[in-house]
Amino acid sequence: MFYTAATALRDFLKQESAGGIVLMFAAVLALIFANTALADTYFSVLATEIAVTVGGGGIEKPALLWINDGLMAVFFFLVGLEVKREVLTGQLSSWKQASLPLIAAFGGIVLPALVFYGINSGTPENLSGWAIPAATDIAFALGILALLGKRVPVALKALLLAIAVIDDIAAIAIIAIFYTPGVELAMLGAAAITLLILSAFGRAKAGSSIPYIVLGIVLWYFVLKSGVHATLAGVALAMTVPLIDRKGNHMLEHMEHALHSWVAFLVVPIFALANAGVSFEGVELSALFAPLPLGIALGLIVGKQVGIFGFAWLAVKTGFAQLPSSVGWLQVWGLSLVAGIGFTMSLFIGNLAFADPAQINAVKIGVLSGSLIAALVGIAILVLGAKAPAAKSADERVQAPA
């Protein structure tokens, strides 16, 4: 089936918005499990060892790590497909289209990290979590915009989407560079050879998805064993998928479209269910003001807000970018707060940054409180800044910010 860039964007917004609502439900369910009589069962299930053996080798991991290392590789594969499409044919394919989201996203990555560092500079053991508040959960953020309906112009959703894609690129780079403790060269070499074979299929524009599935699993195994985080195999695999196969079918967009529902309604909610369960037993309000959770929360609330809005304002005022005609500054301010919903990616990076259960619990408190406050304040500002946009054609409605 033929999918235009506009159709792909509309499908993406629809799926991720609906998925955001499911994600909210999964997060609430995790909190209920972790703070009721079901807590022991909940944490016991996540700690259950699961072994998969093939031939003479195999992998044995707790259920939680199968979700974080295995299932989330599918999520990162979809992220990789979206990034490749946006760079080749979408909102990041030219400077005119990409300038505003690029500059805004840069501010939204740097400022939260600086806020976190400033608050945790006196506690060196926390500094490895500097990237936690730099992330944006696109499913949650678009879910919030979806709840506001027509009060939010499509151009604002497109701007948020572009910022989130750039944010994902940065998160992938951060994970690869800063959260890879050691590398097993033999396994990394095997992964590289597998990736070269996949690239050959991509260059030949092979139209079957079977080689990508089979070799993708092999690539994931080698990357896992190499010491590099296994989810990055998903991103690498996505880079080998051709935009158009030899028969002229839009293979990348077709694959992206086929995966959306699975990721939005299964993969990410399962991740949330497994990772958002923080026990509040014995936790006092003062725990929120400890450096680690406070740095994360303020990074998401203040850092994202000042970074995205401030850099976007400077870019427009200095002539480096242009604000879409249907979007006002009050709406950009609301967007900058909604982008402070870190959730999925923030929790994911938190699990990479820390091994101590107490620190991971503090990360969850910071991410949940910061994301909740950012969402509520962002919604209030977007409601205040709501205006009825003029009717536009389908192409104009999905056109990226210029």
Swiss-Prot record:
Pfam families: Na_H_antiport_1. Its main location: membrane. GO terms for biological process: regulation of pH. It catalyses: Na(+)(in) + 2 H(+)(out) = Na(+)(out) + 2 H(+)(in). One of its GO terms (molecular function) is sodium:proton antiporter activity. GO terms for cellular component: plasma membrane. The chain crosses the membrane at residues 18-38, 63-83, 99-119, 129-149, 158-178, 182-202, 210-230, 258-278, 296-316, 329-349, 365-385. Keywords: Antiport, Cell inner membrane, Cell membrane, Ion transport, Membrane, Sodium, Sodium transport, Transmembrane, Transmembrane helix, Transport. Belongs to the NhaA Na(+)/H(+) (TC 2.A.33) antiporter family. Na(+)/H(+) antiporter that extrudes sodium in exchange for external protons. This is Na(+)/H(+) antiporter NhaA 2. It comes from Erythrobacter litoralis (strain HTCC2594).
